[in-house]
Amino acid sequence: MAGSLPPCVVDCGTGYTKLGYAGNTEPQFIIPSCIAIRESAKVVDQAQRRVLRGVDDLDFFIGDEAIDKPTYATKWPIRHGIVEDWDLMERFMEQVVFKYLRAEPEDHYFLMTEPPLNTPENREYLAEIMFESFNVPGLYIAVQAVLALAASWTSRQVGERTLTGIVIDSGDGVTHVIPVAEGYVIGSCIKHIPIAGRDITYFIQQLLREREVGIPPEQSLETAKAIKEKYCYICPDIVREFAKYDVDPRKWIKQYTGINAINQKKFIIDVGYERFLGPEIFFHPEFANPDFMESISDVVDEVIQSCPIDVRRPLYKNVVLSGGSTMFRDFGRRLQRDLKRVVDARLKLSQELSGGRIKPKPVEVQVVTHHMQRYAVWFGGSMLASTPEFFQVCHTKKDYEEYGPSICRHNPVFGVMS
């Protein structure tokens, strides 16, 4: 039975969890990764909380329902991509499986995703939950970066299918730059950038607040988020962009209409410089975070330069974008231009230092954008879980009972040949 039904693919992120069945192009559900629980009057530690489990255990909500429950305590079990509270995560998964996917877990193989540099212990915890609590027949824990690379095969820019590339995964909570060679993550070279979707939202909120436009204070964050998603884009040159707005403001300034949640009256805001200043913090992080000065193109270049020399050219040739915060218009084009400038400057310098005797071979820089970018990790999982090889590489319940949770510490790479 388990082999005949499609595997379930669950991608748990800091902000949102994407879930659905393998073989589909988009996840069936995208829900906030939060859980609303009734907190008892007594503050107890985790060990006691396990003892006190009972009726309270069933009284919880996840996703959008959790956000709409003001009388409950809303918790986010995942921070910066890593699961921090496994008790809450188990309850979260319970509703994911039974309420959203409406699946009988004994009948479906599961593909779960994990962030880069996840600890082997965390894989074991996940295996325990899936095999012990849900009794799944098979589990595969895939690295998000590898799935994002697989998803990029749908792009017209990609000639041959390869699992060598550099993944820029930018979600709500964190942006990672992850080099992958032949399907294996080069862990020592990963870098993270403390700028992601949430920071852009906060920055836009701050810009709007400074202008003192008539936004109700309790709605300022959601208004900033809506403006970010609807109107923001990446500009090629920030000085020219300011000039463009000053010359013809009517053409470029947009209007956002919102409704005051308390008195139901409309409010209208002009959205001007915020449109390009928001996402610009990827390339000029000092605008929002004075402690971090490196642009995303410099970080990508540094990561590639720290990798083994024989994979550097293939990495420059396959820079793959993944996650909702890479969806801004012209993000890929600007990144490719800036990265090419850095690389060309280095080649020019080496030529000058050699007195013109050495002419370096030009480096091809290509940033791959594709229409599956927003849910790239989930879609890559959906693709790979649809292949016959998936069932061969899955860790089965039988293996788990024989060897224990340590089998899930290692998950073989597959899918290059398919």
Curated annotation (Swiss-Prot):
Keyword Transport: no
SMART domains linked: ACTIN
CDD domains: ASKHA_NBD_Arp3-like
Coiled coil: none
Subcellular location: Cytoplasm, Cytoskeleton; Cell projection
GO MF, one example: ATP binding
Assembly and interaction partners: Interacts with the Arp2/3 complex composed of ARP2, ARP3, ARPC1B, ARPC1B/p41-ARC, ARPC2/p34-ARC, ARPC3/p21-ARC, ARPC4/p20-ARC and ARPC5/p16-ARC.
Similarity section: Belongs to the actin family. ARP3 subfamily.
Name of the protein described by the UniProt record: Actin-related protein 3B
Organism encoding this protein: Mus musculus (Mouse)
Source species taxonomy: Eukaryota, Metazoa, Chordata, Craniata, Vertebrata
